[in-house]
Amino acid sequence: MQEQYVPQSIEPAVQKHWDAKKTFKAVEKVDKEKFYCLSMFPYPSGRLHMGHVRNYTIGDVISRYQRLNGKNVLQPIGWDAFGLPAENAAIKNNTAPAPWTYENIEYMKNQLKMLGLGYDWDRELATCKPDYYRWEQWFFTKLYEKGLVYKKTSSVNWCPNDMTVLANEQVVDNCCWRCDTPVEQKEIPQWFIKITDYAEELLNDIDNLEGWPEMVKTMQRNWIGRSEGVNISFAIEGQTEHLEVYTTRPDTFMGVTYVGIAAGHPLALQAAESNPELAAFIEECKNTKVAEAELATMEKKGMATGLYAIHPLDGRKVPVWVANFVLMNYGTGAVMAVPGHDLRDHEFATKYGLEIKPVIKPVDGELPNVIDAAYTDKGVLFNSGEFDGLEFQPAFDAIASKLESLGCGKRTVNFRLRDWGVSRQRYWGAPIPMLTLADGTVVPTPEDQLPVLLPEDVVMDGIQSPIKADAEWAKTTYNGQEAFRETDTFDTFMESSWYYARYCSPDYDKGMLDPAAANHWLPVDQYIGGIEHACMHLLYARFFHKLLRDAGLVNSDEPFKRLLCQGMVLADAFYYKDEKGGNVWVSPTDVKVERDEKGRITKAVDNEGREVIHSGMTKMSKSKNNGIDPQLMVERYGADTVRLFMMFASPAEMTLEWSDSGVEGAQRFLRRLWRITFEHVSAGVAPALNVAALSVDQKAVRRELHKTIAKVSDDVGRRQTFNTAIAAIMELMNNLAKLGSDEQDRALMQEALEAVVVMLYPITPHIGFELWKMLGKGDDVDHATWPVADEAAMVETEKLVVVQINGKMRGKLTVPAEISQADVEKLAMADASVQKFTDGLTVRKVIYVPGKLLNIVAN
């Protein structure tokens, strides 16, 4: 039993014990309630960052808490190991992605163990291993057979530098988010999965996600984007072709003055054949940024095609324009334009001098001036012939019915969600298991040829994927015929869409999942990860779960019961200007600062003696060189201190500001806890607690102990406000200082320290492990039981009332909790110390705060 708290000697020994005992190995137990806790698995980039530490500490706290509450806990870990960064690193370091990835996995695995995270390492998986992606390939072929997979040529964002397709979200200012290369538009064949077949269910089931943050649910609803509207068909003057549009505002239909079409629309391409100027404009549009989020702010450009659409209801001819804000891969690639009642249409019409026709006015207002600005609210129709006077819904129904009766319209439900393009033109990913035969027929790779292995011993030239460059790799046979493998690889969101399920049976080789194990553990009870994954990973995982269900592999509808989105970790960022005026960012660990009385930085100097500029607290990032190395912090302060700071400094879902003084404060608290426990134990074995024999003061301390147990249990288990739980424990420790050294004081201290150690154990498990032994407990704290608040102890039978005379304290009374004001006054007036100050005075007024204060006003 060492007197000083030295985490560097404690923590490795405790971790070794956990490893040897396989403390956190999970097995299916029917006699215990299961709890599956999962943090989003990391990409093996090489080193953990503080964002990882926060995510995984939160998950570990929840897991350990549930284990102490008698649950059978599964907390696995693995590696989201495919992806472009490995290719870039391989090129930079003159190696192949595979060895770079495997080395990083080993290094980061040791870092995770150093943090004391209670994982079942026997379930570790890496998505780049064939025994993982084999089943992903198998499942893809089954989806193909069910008609849920198809291939089509589509316009994509193409990064010519990385030779890959980019999602709209990966294009920033018309450049690649990774390498800043200008993005081009390119037509290529791609594989898609029909997520739109599940759009309605994905939307409706959001209502069942009771344990998810409202913000994430709202983001998914908006991303799926269900709308009710009308598909309308316009005849084209002089042609047999028709132009299809979709609108959610058929009430504005009589205000259509032009039709906008995408640059890639067949009518645009047809018109361009005889119009070189239009052809050049279409080419310009094809290489314009197409992120939907930027459509509202981008400059609107267009050109007339010379074609005219015929308005189905009034026969008017309206011009057809190619417009850069109309996207071919959204909807029909054409829009009806109502500049009087749509901001974008108005901006375009004003720029090009097109007609602006008002057809909606406020219910109780004047006619809108639509020449200056579009009137976008709903209202009453005018200027609309037989539909004049109708409000929105009656107008919607009447115009939709009229169009349907004429055979040129149909009510329809539309979704913003598009099918999931899973093809990637990169190497380090799972090969897509499809074959093309000599006659062009496309077939899935037969099951006995799976997995389609990705060769790992490759040379990266930075230009083309090695499997695209290697003609021999693509060659294979199918039923004796020559066949060629698909050389695209899967979007890495494929791997992360089902990994949570594979953890249930990671070594199962008879199928994608062992249904018994999967249905024992799933759904995940608690999932932890960043809110940036709300609309991609979390939606794809929900979709995949429904696919697994419909394949008979799982019997639940949703993958994750409860979701916690942790906030970012921020740190101070410092820079100085170089000779060219550029910012040179300096690590905060290399900067000494001076602060004012409010803690604000007033001066900062780096290790070179150079004064640097403080740019504020920003997200830890490589670009600003303000990441704090978790390994360095663990080596300096210990894992428990880092974990305690992470859980205490901020609510879990809010941003966390890194603070050296905060970390030091966390370590001071742990040292104090160690010292108090050591002193308590050094005085000998504590006697048994006799609740009936406790004094008023001892009862008050015990009441605070059990109130704290109740609060911490609720804060950690239900509310997940871990910072307030820690604050309550710290306050309790201050109250324990009131205890003396008599037998019942020591007995009460023993009860309190045992409770404190167990309550802190999920957050600071190493010191908890040692202090539990120090307190003389036989079993490991890993198998202890979470303390239960004693309801009787929390009942206040007595209150301490302060007695004041004319606002000055003159005495204290211990009174029954339910005493009346009259009885308190009698006791006060009978108290000698009070009488001394009231003799000869007349009581004018009595102010009573029940159970706390009695103020007698007398003169």
From Swiss-Prot:
Record: residues binding ATP: K622
Motif ('KMSKS' region): 619-623
GO molecular function terms listed in the Swiss-Prot or TrEMBL record: aminoacyl-tRNA deacylase activity; ATP binding; leucine-tRNA ligase activity
GO biological process, one term: leucyl-tRNA aminoacylation
Keywords: Aminoacyl-tRNA synthetase, ATP-binding, Cytoplasm, Ligase, Nucleotide-binding, Protein biosynthesis
Catalyzed reaction equations: tRNA(Leu) + L-leucine + ATP = L-leucyl-tRNA(Leu) + AMP + diphosphate
Residues spanned by motif 'HIGH' region: 42-52
Compartments where found: Cytoplasm
Domain of life (superkingdom): Bacteria
EC number: 6.1.1.4
InterPro entries tied to this protein: aa-tRNA-synth_I_CS, aa-tRNA-synth_Ia, Leu-tRNA-ligase, Leu_tRNA-synth_edit, M/V/L/I-tRNA-synth_anticd-bd, Methionyl/Leucyl_tRNA_Synth, Rossmann-like_a/b/a_fold, tRNAsynth_Ia_anticodon-bd
Primary enzyme class: ligase
Family of the protein in this entry: Belongs to the class-I aminoacyl-tRNA synthetase family.
NCBIfam families associated with the record: leuS_bact
Protein name, per record: Leucine--tRNA ligase
Taxonomic source organism: Aeromonas hydrophila subsp. hydrophila (strain ATCC 7966 / DSM 30187 / BCRC 13018 / CCUG 14551 / JCM 1027 / KCTC 2358 / NCIMB 9240 / NCTC 8049)
